[in-house]
């Protein structure tokens, strides 16, 4: 596995397992929204529901076209996230 995959896979897997809604921005500026259904080395399968059409669609998104993946909330189960920074204690000086 490539070194770059070591952060990407656990992050995407946590988004998938927790069914966290995401916004995926493509390099051409298009914003896609939905939940990550699956992914592999090259693609992300994004599941979206259209309220106006009352149906669910799945889109295959090639990773080389992705600029940014933005979760709608914090990801809790990613093992690569560092613990939150703590404020230094006041030593009274």
UniProtKB/Swiss-Prot annotation:
Alphabetical list of PROSITE patterns matching this protein: SM
Keyword Manganese: no
A Pfam family annotated for this UniProt entry: Hfq
GO CC terms: cytosol
Domain annotation Sm: ranges: 9-75
A Gene Ontology biological process term: regulation of RNA stability
Protein's UniProt keywords contain Coiled coil: no
InterPro entries according to UniProt: Hfq, LSM_dom_sf, Sm
Keywords annotated in UniProt: RNA-binding, Stress response
GO molecular function: RNA binding
Residue span of region Disordered: 73-93
Gene3D superfamilies with a match to the protein in the record: 2.30.30.100
Family: Belongs to the Hfq family.
Function field: RNA chaperone that binds small regulatory RNA (sRNAs) and mRNAs to facilitate mRNA translational regulation in response to envelope stress, environmental stress and changes in metabolite concentrations. Also binds with high specificity to tRNAs.
Subunit structure: Homohexamer.
Name of protein: RNA-binding protein Hfq
Natural source organism: Hamiltonella defensa subsp. Acyrthosiphon pisum (strain 5AT)
């Amino acid at each position: 596995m490539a070194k770059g995959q070591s952060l990407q896979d656990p992050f995407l897997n946590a988004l998938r397992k927790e069914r966290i809604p995401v916004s995926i921005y493509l390099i051409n500026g298009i914003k896609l929204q939905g939940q990550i259904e699956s992914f592999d080395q090259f693609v992300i399968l994004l599941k979206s529901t259209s309220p106006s059409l009352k149906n669910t669609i799945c889109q295959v998104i090639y990773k080389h076209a992705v600029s940014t993946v933005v979760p709608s909330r914090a990801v809790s189960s990613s093992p690569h996230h560092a613990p939150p920074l703590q404020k230094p204690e006041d030593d009274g000086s």
